[in-house]
């Protein structure tokens, strides 16, 4: 054995210490400049209130903090403070704990603390399907709350979920019938057999604002927790919300709209009789999305003779038998944290003489890469690349210009126009500028025109009017083809978007969208120029744009704003197009977003735009297997070529 191999090696250097993880973000101490402002009030807005099991104390929320108060009124004592938003407090039936909703963990979740405000801890730790409106089971061991589910619209719908007070992922109790009609405000019956909640039961699956509250928007549902039977329990004109069972199990308080007023009612659970108690409530939220409840939570006193509720800025107690209302005075004195507004340190001119044009639309580079065209301020502009000056493509001022696209030889540009009175046209103009020639046969709603590779045909999309637009010339929407010099157009497909050509002039690629309740099916399809032989090539739920390269070897697509490129497969089954696809190699080419995807004439470079910047990337910079690719592929470009311009501001004169 060589002696050098037998030597004792020197001690290895200790591994470098891993960098310390950044501290968790604290809602109550976010690190922003803040100030404390005094708070001294005897009224509040949208306050949920609960009565302690012994009936001697109230707990309520006000401006994101929780307070206790003697039931007769007086000075309120803060249980929680800070920037976190705490709300909807509920005493446990054993009187030892308070459950509440808080965003102190970053989003609305269920929390528990001792009755004196100490030892607060989260019961749930959802980061997306957030929770609110906790209600205790009679044994004080479980909570039921509204869990939030969103889909295609922003606010979504609720389900009732059961959680042990120690935590866990929860048990689903109800299933939302769709993703837009809400449900919430859960409440246990005192024996624990039933769960009441309010639900929007208006017809259809689509939420609509401005529904008629004099009809029936919400009903109170009752879920039998033993048999799982669900039944509409309180129904009728004016709707029914905020179910609140009495401790003796004989009554159910709720809120109903009576003409223009929100009215407190009580229902006898034996006879079914419903009796109005008080018509001075604040307006409930039946006509809108009410993910935190249609009316603030209220509570019975332990003897089931009185209700405590919020209305007109005050806490009130009503004797159910006599309907006599007694205010419960409260005084909250403390502070609130205000954070400094975000603003630019530099003064901004309100009306500058000139302003930068940043909103460039339908940016398209010529096939040779020597010129770019785009729409700005309602008209088309061209600019020589890389450093030319933008100039108007036409000189007309009678209509707006949109959707420009170069011919494959770069000599012509096809585009669409719009006029509020005369509607729209498809036109062709020299890439050097001039007067556009109309090639469409009649006025209409035209979008996304494109030349065939041989320059003889133009495909475009015709849509329809209605709603805010006139309904004329709207009977036959779809994809059309017309000769470059005009003539009678021919419909290729009754639907489709973004028509364009690949290598040949005999086949048109387009995006086909089939709407679904939860997600769309968004397919790359093609059809012969004679309207026959339809094919489906790619499918996705998220892709908003497909663009086939001129040689038909590649496809670019936009998914969740960013741009991606993949080889375009031939034959076989329809391939799923996705940034996470495993069927074919996929590369992200944009860093922030990739709008208006299009290819160079030789299919070696992809272009896109973001605001006033033009970006591009060669395929050899995106895939290591492309000829000429560097050993290490570059990251997506951070900065593009500025192609916008300064425009004189339209400054008003006079007084």
Residue spans of the language-model regions?
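Loop/turn segments within WD40 beta-propeller blades
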Residues: 51-54, 301-303, 366-368, 549-551, ...
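N-terminal, post-signal-peptide region of Sec/Tat-exported proteins
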Residues: 47-81, 86-87
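Conserved beta-strand position repeated across blades of beta-propeller domains
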Residues: 50, 90, 135, 187, ...
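A short helix->beta-strand "capping" segment at the edge of beta-propeller domains
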Residues: 22-46, 76, 340-358, 581-589, ...
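Signature of short aromatic-glycine-proline-rich micro-motifs recurring in repeat-based ectodomains
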Residues: 45-48, 186, 289-303, 346-364, ...
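A flexible loop/linker signature enriched in serine peptidases of the S9 family
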Residues: 42, 61-67, 82-86, 93, ...
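Boundary at the C-terminal end of the N-terminal hydrophobic targeting segment
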Residues: 4-6
């Amino acid at each position: 054995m060589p002696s050098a191999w037998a030597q004792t090696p020197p001690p290895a250097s200790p591994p470098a210490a891993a960098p310390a993880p950044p501290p968790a973000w604290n809602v109550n101490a976010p690190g922003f400049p803040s100030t404390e402002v005094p708070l001294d009030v005897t009224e509040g807005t949208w306050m949920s209130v609960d009565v302690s099991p012994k009936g001697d104390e109230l707990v309520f929320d006000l401006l994101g903090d929780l307070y206790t108060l003697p039931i007769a009124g007086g000075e309120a004592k803060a249980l929680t403070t800070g920037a976190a938003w705490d709300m909807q407090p509920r005493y446990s039936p054993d009187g030892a704990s308070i459950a509440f909703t808080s965003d102190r963990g970053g989003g609305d979740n269920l929390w528990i603390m001792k009755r004196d405000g100490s030892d607060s801890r989260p019961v749930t730790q959802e980061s997306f399907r957030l929770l609110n409106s906790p209600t205790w089971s009679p044994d004080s061991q479980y909570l039921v709350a509204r869990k939030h589910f969103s889909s295609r619209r922003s606010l979504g719908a609720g389900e009732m979920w059961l959680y042990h007070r120690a935590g866990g992922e929860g048990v689903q109790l109800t299933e939302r019938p769709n993703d837009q009609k809400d449900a919430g405000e859960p409440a246990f019956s005192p024996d624990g057999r039933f769960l009441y909640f309010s639900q929007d039961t208006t017809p259809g699956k689509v939420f609509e604002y401005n529904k008629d509250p004099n009809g029936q928007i919400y009903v109170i549902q009752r879920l039998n927790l033993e048999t799982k039977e669900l039944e509409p329990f309180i129904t009728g004109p004016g709707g029914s919300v905020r179910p609140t069972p009495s401790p003796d199990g004989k009554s159910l308080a709720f809120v109903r709209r009576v003409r223009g007023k929100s009215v407190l009612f009580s229902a006898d659970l034996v006879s079914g009789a419903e009796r109005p108690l008080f018509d001075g409530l604040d307006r409930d939220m039946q006509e809108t999305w009410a993910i935190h409840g249609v009316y603030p939570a209220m509570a019975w006193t332990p003897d089931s003779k009185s209700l405590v509720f919020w209305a007109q800025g005050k806490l009130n107690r009503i004797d159910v038998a006599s309907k006599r209302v007694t205010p419960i005075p409260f005084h909250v004195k403390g502070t609130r944290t205000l954070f400094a507004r975000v603003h630019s340190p530099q003064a901004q001119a309100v009306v500058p003489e000139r302003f930068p044009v940043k909103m460039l639309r339908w940016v398209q580079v010529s096939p040779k890469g020597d010129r770019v065209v785009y729409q700005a301020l309602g008209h088309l502009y061209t600019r020589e690349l890389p450093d030319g000056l933008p100039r108007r493509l036409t000189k007309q001022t009678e209509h707006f210009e949109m959707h420009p696209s170069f011919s494959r030889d770069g000599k012509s540009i096809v585009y669409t126009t719009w006029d509020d009175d005369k509607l729209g046209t498809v036109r062709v103009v020299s890439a050097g500028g001039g007067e556009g020639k109309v090639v469409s046969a009649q006025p209409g709603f035209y979008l996304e025109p494109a030349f065939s590779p041989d320059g003889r045909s133009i495909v475009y999309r015709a849509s329809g009017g209605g709603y805010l637009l006139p309904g004329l010339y709207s009977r036959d929407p779809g994809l059309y083809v017309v000769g470059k010099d005009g003539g009678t157009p021919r419909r290729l497909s009754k639907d489709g978007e973004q028509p364009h050509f690949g290598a040949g002039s005999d086949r048109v690629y387009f995006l086909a969208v089939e709407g679904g309740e939860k997600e769309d099916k968004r397919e790359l399809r093609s059809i012969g120029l004679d309207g026959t032989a339809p094919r489906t090539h790619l499918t996705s739920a998220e892709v908003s744009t497909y663009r086939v390269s001129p040689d038909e070897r590649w496809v670019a697509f936009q998914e969740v704003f960013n741009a991606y490129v993949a080889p375009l497969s031939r034959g076989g089954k329809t391939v799923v197009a996705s940034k996470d696809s495993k069927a074919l190699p996929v590369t992200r080419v944009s860093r922030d977003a990739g709008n208006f995807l299009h290819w160079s004439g030789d299919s070696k470079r992809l272009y896109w735009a973001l605001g006033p910047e033009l970006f591009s990337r060669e395929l050899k910079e995106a895939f290591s297997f492309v000829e000429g690719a560097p050993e290490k592929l570059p990251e997506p470009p951070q900065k593009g070529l500025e192609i916008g311009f300064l425009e004189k501001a339209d400054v008003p004169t006079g007084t």
